[in-house]
């Protein structure tokens, strides 16, 4: 079978033995995310026609207004994972605490926890900008047969066994890694099937795009300001092109395909950064590294940061390897 005619289901079956633990459970988790993503995609595509755009009148744990689609997507992903009884715990951007999944027999026998941002960039729905889902999978560290604890979730990114994202754009794509490269699958909406469309995705070592909210320039640390000036200077192959959508998944996806760097630094308004380590930065860092890129907080490898809380925030520099290296150089020289 030609690679590009291969479905996601066929790809998972063929590559199951390359998974770190050769587990059917992990394959079922990816399949569950695929199913939930198709349901969410249907709602996203109808967002302008029904009453599911705009704010729901509540705030999540971060104090951010919850969009109606945020709430819907969160429920769909959680219920899909719970109903299939394949995980022992779930953590979401939209929930204050983690969810313990005991299973119908109350055995707590499953081995994996899933962390997710069910609908990244959902504030853009009203203006028809691409949004996405981000997910991360860890093997639990507490004994099987016992309820999960916070320690099962507070693991460094290097412990991830799978990570990925779904981008709901002009086409819907699911991109994921299990530590053996990155592959992208595009949904054929006519038959509801994901097909392998982007095998072995790779960052270029160098890129020509930088992505950040330059409207916050005055609030950025000096190292970031210096890097922006470097990107804009007319030397060598510069100036670089500035492209910023405001949806992490969308900006990351474009930069991985075209070559570039995404930066969400600390600022005087957000001294710890804005993005969450466990269900935004760590999974994207895993994907980036598997695609030959690099991810950092400006000084340290994202994948090696030991989380201390579920909704911990960190600054995020991610993209083409040499671009992130250069940004780190500016940060360290002005520390």
From Swiss-Prot:
Catalysed transformations (reactions): beta-D-fructose 1,6-bisphosphate + H2O = beta-D-fructose 6-phosphate + phosphate
Range of residues in the leader sequence: none
Protein's UniProt name: Fructose-1,6-bisphosphatase class 1
Pfam family, one: FBPase
Disulfide bonds, paired cysteine numbers: none
Alphabetically ordered keywords of this record: Carbohydrate metabolism, Cytoplasm, Hydrolase, Magnesium, Metal-binding
Family in the record: Belongs to the FBPase class 1 family.
């Amino acid at each position: 079978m030609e690679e590009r005619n291969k479905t996601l289901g066929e790809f998972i079956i063929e590559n199951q033995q390359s998974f770190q633990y050769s587990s059917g459970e992990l394959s079922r988790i990816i399949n569950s995310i695929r199913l939930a993503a198709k349901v969410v995609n249907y709602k996203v595509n109808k967002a302008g026609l029904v009453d599911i755009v705009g704010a729901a009148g509540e705030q999540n744990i971060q104090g951010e207004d919850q969009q109606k689609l945020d709430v819907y997507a969160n429920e769909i992903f959680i219920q899909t994972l719970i109903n299939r009884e394949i995980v022992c715990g779930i953590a979401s951007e939209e929930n204050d605490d983690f969810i313990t999944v005991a299973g119908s027999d109350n055995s707590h026998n499953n081995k994996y926890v899933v962390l997710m941002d069910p609908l990244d960039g959902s504030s853009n729905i009203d203006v028809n900008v691409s949004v996405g889902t981000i997910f991360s999978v860890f093997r639990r560290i507490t004994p099987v047969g016992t309820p999960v604890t916070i320690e099962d979730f507070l693991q460094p990114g290097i412990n991830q066994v799978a990570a990925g994202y779904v981008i709901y754009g002009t086409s819907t794509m699911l991109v994921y890694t299990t530590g053996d490269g990155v592959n992208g699958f595009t949904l054929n909406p006519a038959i509801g099937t994901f097909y392998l469309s982007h095998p072995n995705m790779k960052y270029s070592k160098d890129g020509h795009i930088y992505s950040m909210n330059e409207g916050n320039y005055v609030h950025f640390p000096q190292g970031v300001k210096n890097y922006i000036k470097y990107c804009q200077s007319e030397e060598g192959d510069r100036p670089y092109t500035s492209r910023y959508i405001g949806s992490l998944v969308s900006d990351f996806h474009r930069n991985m395909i075209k070559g570039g760097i995404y930066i969400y630094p600390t600022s005087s308004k957000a001294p710890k950064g804005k993005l969450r380590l466990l269900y935004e930065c760590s999974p994207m860092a895993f994907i980036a590294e598997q695609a030959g890129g690099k991810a950092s907080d400006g000084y340290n490898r994202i994948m090696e940061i030991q989380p201390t809380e579920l909704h911990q925030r960190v600054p995020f520099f991610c993209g083409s390897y040499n671009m992130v290296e250069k940004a780190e150089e500016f940060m360290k020289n002005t520390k």
